[in-house]
Amino acid sequence: MSIILGIDPGSRITGYGVIRQNGRHLQYLGSGCIRMSEKELPGRLKQIYAGVSEIITQFQPDVFAIEQVFMSKNADSALKLGQARGSAIVAAVNADLPVYEYAARLIKQAVTGTGGADKSQVQHMVMSMLKLPAKPQADAADALGAAICHANTNKTLIALAGKATGARRGRYR
């Protein structure tokens, strides 16, 4: 049994989702969004770090799963997204959590069955898979998708290897 924290990074809104994996069963523990009130990027990065650290303290996850940066036509947006990811990852590493990264297409495929799914499809499937009473916010649904993707990927790796994947705690690779 493990608790997985999923993160959908963003420089203005960072989504988070927490699930418990017990064998094949996934249980919803919580989700939401960290909304940045700071205007300047350094202040927003500090808010991401503090927010993710608080979530880690509250839920005590065993694993941290985060969406990878995608290549954007706007280089400035991609750089800001990378910095937001870095703030969240540092919070996880400081808590000695193993960090796993997943491409957005892989997360969408794990949740909806297709890598080209839109946000509403991800929301609908996350709601269905976790038996939620209502659709989660889009960024929170993406974060829950990252956690679900890790749970499914981890189960597959364990089945293929016949044992745990051997990730080292607190090591970012």
Curated annotation (Swiss-Prot):
Keywords for this protein: Cytoplasm, DNA damage, DNA recombination, DNA repair, DNA-binding, Endonuclease, Hydrolase, Magnesium, Metal-binding, Nuclease
Pfam families per the UniProt record, alphabetical: RuvC
Assembly and oligomerization: Homodimer which binds Holliday junction (HJ) DNA. The HJ becomes 2-fold symmetrical on binding to RuvC with unstacked arms; it has a different conformation from HJ DNA in complex with RuvA. In the full resolvosome a probable DNA-RuvA(4)-RuvB(12)-RuvC(2) complex forms which resolves the HJ.
Gene Ontology CC annotations of this record: cytoplasm; Holliday junction resolvase complex
Top enzyme category: hydrolase
Annotated GO MF terms: crossover junction DNA endonuclease activity; DNA binding; magnesium ion binding
Record Gene3D superfamilies: Ribonuclease H-like superfamily/Ribonuclease H (3.30.420.10)
Protein task: The RuvA-RuvB-RuvC complex processes Holliday junction (HJ) DNA during genetic recombination and DNA repair. Endonuclease that resolves HJ intermediates. Cleaves cruciform DNA by making single-stranded nicks across the HJ at symmetrical positions within the homologous arms, yielding a 5'-phosphate and a 3'-hydroxyl group; requires a central core of homology in the junction. The consensus cleavage sequence is 5'-(A/T)TT(C/G)-3'. Cleavage occurs on the 3'-side of the TT dinucleotide at the point of strand exchange.
Protein name (record): Crossover junction endodeoxyribonuclease RuvC
Organism listed in the record: Aliivibrio fischeri (strain ATCC 700601 / ES114)
EC number annotated for this UniProt entry: 3.1.21.10
Co-factor binding details: Binds 2 Mg(2+) ion per subunit.
Subcellular location: Cytoplasm
GO biological processes: DNA recombination; DNA repair
